[in-house]
């Protein structure tokens, strides 16, 4: 009986020790992070998911600028512009207004050169005409409408926007929605443009079409 009892004790102790070793090994493994081989020359903290600028759905290639533009919503929410991950115009920055909001960016460096808003309902259209006439070469032009961009729009202004690459400037009218990125002396029409006509049958808001959003990657210097 003593031998049998001793065997039971030994088996019991062996079982306890085995379980303890197993549990210790398991919990130790679960706390470890999977490490890459040293010969790769990198550690896990070096692996980071690249973040797109301006919240774009993709990362822009080298020598491209990231941008995102939203038109205003009716006459309630103002437009916003993001360029290279910087909000350059928005209601929060308190630098947008009714009509057309325009920002000029150096097409080579990406530096914001000038920005302003122009009241196209009761303001002086000559101010916008002067602004557009003085745009230097190799300049990117970002435009977002708010409330009413077209009442004071004249043929000279429409022609200047068309020369910047717009396909819809000549159609712009009362309370239309418009977002656009063009460039000085562009040889062809810009691919970065959206336009919605004010139409009571299709308007999303009472008296205004839906707001528009435009995002993408624009190449340096030449579009």
From Swiss-Prot:
Write down the Pfam families for this protein, in alphabetical order: ILEI
Residue ranges spanning the membrane: these are none
Q: List the disulfide bonds.
A: 54-82, 60-217
Q: Does the keyword Signal apply?
A: yes
Q: Which PROSITE patterns does the protein's record reference? A: GG_LECTIN
- Report the glycosylation sites: 106
Question: Which positions carry the signal peptide feature in this UniProt record?
Answer: 1-25
Name the Gene Ontology biological process terms.
Answer: aorta development; negative regulation of insulin secretion; neutrophil homeostasis; neutrophil migration; positive regulation of macrophage antigen processing and presentation; signal transduction
- The protein depicted here goes by the name Protein FAM3D
């Amino acid at each position: 009986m003593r031998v049998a009892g001793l065997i039971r004790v030994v088996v019991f102790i062996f079982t306890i020790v085995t379980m303890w070793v197993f549990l210790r090994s398991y919990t130790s493994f679960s706390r470890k992070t999977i490490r890459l081989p040293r010969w790769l020359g990198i550690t896990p903290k070096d692996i980071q998911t690249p973040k797109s600028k301006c919240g774009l759905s993709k990362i822009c290639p080298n020598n491209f600028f990231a941008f995102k533009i939203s038109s205003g919503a009716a006459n309630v929410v103002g437009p916003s512009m993001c360029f290279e991950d910087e909000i350059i115009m928005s209601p929060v920055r308190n630098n947008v207004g009714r009509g057309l909001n325009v920002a000029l960016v150096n097409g080579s460096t990406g530096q914001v050169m000038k920005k302003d808003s122009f009241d196209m309902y009761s303001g002086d259209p000559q101010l916008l005409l002067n602004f557009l006439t003085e745009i230097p070469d190799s300049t990117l032009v970002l435009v977002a409408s708010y409330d009413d961009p077209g009442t004071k729009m004249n043929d000279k202004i429409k022609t200047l926007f068309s020369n910047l690459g717009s396909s819809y400037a000549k159609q712009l009218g009362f309370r239309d929605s418009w977002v656009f990125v063009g460039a000085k002396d562009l040889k062809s029409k810009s691919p970065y443009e959206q336009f919605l006509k004010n139409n009571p049958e299709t308007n999303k808001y009472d008296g205004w079409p839906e707001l528009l959003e435009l995002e993408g990657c624009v190449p340096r210097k030449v579009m």
